[in-house]
Amino acid sequence: MTNLLGSIRLAAYAFPLIAALVAVPFFDRQVRARCFNWVRTVFGGLFLFYVLCVLALVFFPLPDAAQAARLSGHEIQLVPFQFVADFLRETPLVLSDARTYLPALFDRTVLQVVCNILMLLPFGMYLRYVCGLDLGKVALVSLAFSAFIELGQLTGLFFMFRGSYRLCDVDDLMLNTLGGLLLSLIHISEPTRLGMISY
């Protein structure tokens, strides 16, 4: 929870500057097209803040000088569905004992899977219902965003550090992409894009 709140705080600090940089070309495009929609603008701002929160959560806190000096090599977990083996090995679940079901559901391995899915739910929802992308494009963009995150973790924040300080995991890639698609699958008919209001 502390890490989550710290990530939101960091995103809040960075948001005004990045929003200002994005706003200039955005508003210029709207003026040239002679159309403007405050709803899309608000959703766009919320989406930008959400993306900053995700990036802060997956890349921060950075290792300190002592930790960075000990980093070497780049760690990657390439076994698909390793989280299933982790669940069976680490949780207290005993199928014959119903008392272990609830503790197993709140085990770290389960929460990690759930959080990886939830992390990109807003991402896919924005692409599908605000941008109007079809399911295939939502899947590709969600996969690309997740791959960007995992590549950053594999390379030590794109070679800023000598080694990985977070694990690059193929399961995270799959679960993030699933999260990006999940809400889009609930309503498979073509979504109505937020209309442009002319002025």
Question: What does each model-found stretch correspond to?
Answer:
Residues 169:
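Amphipathic alpha-helical recognition patches that constitute DNA-binding helices
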